[in-house]
């Protein structure tokens, strides 16, 4: 059963006087029954999670609220791997805090379900009443501070709004941790479930998977040497909305089980080969290599200093020939 929660925390006023900040108010809402609870310490919050047997709890922006929770767990002797675990990636993106409360209590980030949306945005998205004006929270609050009814109501609003949205999603079968996982689940169901998915995207052998992954590249980011190290004014910035979905809808993409050997005309492919080359005049460099003693991983190569092994998709291979003078190629493997 899903629940939603929110923390209100002290700010600079308390930090300057006490040397620390803390949670001074929390709210908890049952998404199905709309029952509500609130309290003033993380300890009482944990107790309520146990009492209500909360197996899923959503905070909107887990990185903020979760940092107070993890700090409290460490300070109070909870042992990582025994009493709790968490999923936080190298970019400090928070996905889950898992508490062992005698049962598994999974704390997730509702901002991953509604990316880029504030709580107010979520209210507008679902056509429900939004948040009221925020009370003055920038005051000093001693340890025994008792929140006002106005402050309690404001804290509960956040949890109510997200609770409404989560219930709508769960009622429609969208019970994933993130919007991406919900979308992935729907795609699989639309093509025949797991078996249909595996028909289009078969599981590869480790060797074949490794070969394909070598061709994977990120976006092209490049600064013209003509402008490097200079302050440029009156710059125009352009963006393309929904470029990834556009490409997925209109351009050919690889599906199905790949096969070794030269491709037929018009087919997508990945090719590994050894080559040497230099950049054509008035063209852009497009090739980067990893784990090389001769080139920086962030450097686009203008000219090779030794034979270089590349693994490229057919799209990048075509681009490679368009922008580089290729001296030779050998040992092609498709």
Predicted feature residues:
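Conserved acidic
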Residues: 2-4, 18-61, 66-334
């Amino acid at each position: 059963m899903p629940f939603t929660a929110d923390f209100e925390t002290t700010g600079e006023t308390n930090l300057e006087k006490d040397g620390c900040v803390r949670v001074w108010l929390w709210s908890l809402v049952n998404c199905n029954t709309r029952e509500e609870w609130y309290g003033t310490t993380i300890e009482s919050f944990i107790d309520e999670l146990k009492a209500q047997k909360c197996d899923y709890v959503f905070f909107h922006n887990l990185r903020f609220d979760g940092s107070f929770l993890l700090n409290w767990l460490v300070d109070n002797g909870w042992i990582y791997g025994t009493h709790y675990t968490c999923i936080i990636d190298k970019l400090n993106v928070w996905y889950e805090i898992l508490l062992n409360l005698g049962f598994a209590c999974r704390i997730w980030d509702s901002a991953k379900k509604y990316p880029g949306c504030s709580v107010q945005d979520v209210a507008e998205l679902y056509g429900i009443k939004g948040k009221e004006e925020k009370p003055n929270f920038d005051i000093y609050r001693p340890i025994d501070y008792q929140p006002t009814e106005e402050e309690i109501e404001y804290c509960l609003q956040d949890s109510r709004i997200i609770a409404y949205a989560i219930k709508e999603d769960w009622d429609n079968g969208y019970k994933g941790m993130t919007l991406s996982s919900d979308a992935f689940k729907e795609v699989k169901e639309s093509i025949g479930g797991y078996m249909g998915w595996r028909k289009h995207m078969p599981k590869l052998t480790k060797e074949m998977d490794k070969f394909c992954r070598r061709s994977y590249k990120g976006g092209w980011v490049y600064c013209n040497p003509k402008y490097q190290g200079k302050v440029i004014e009156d710059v125009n910035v352009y963006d393309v909305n929904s470029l990834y979905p556009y490409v997925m809808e209109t351009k050919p993409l690889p599906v199905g089980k790949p096969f070794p050997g030269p491709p037929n005309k018009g087919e997508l492919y990945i090719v590994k080969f050894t080559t040497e080359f230099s950049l054509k005049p008035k063209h852009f460099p497009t090739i980067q290599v990893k784990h090389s003693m001769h080139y920086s991983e962030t450097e686009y190569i203008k000219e090779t200093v030794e034979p270089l092994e590349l693994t490229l998709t057919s799209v990048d291979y075509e681009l490679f020939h368009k922008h580089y003078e290729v001296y030779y190629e050998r040992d092609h493997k498709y």
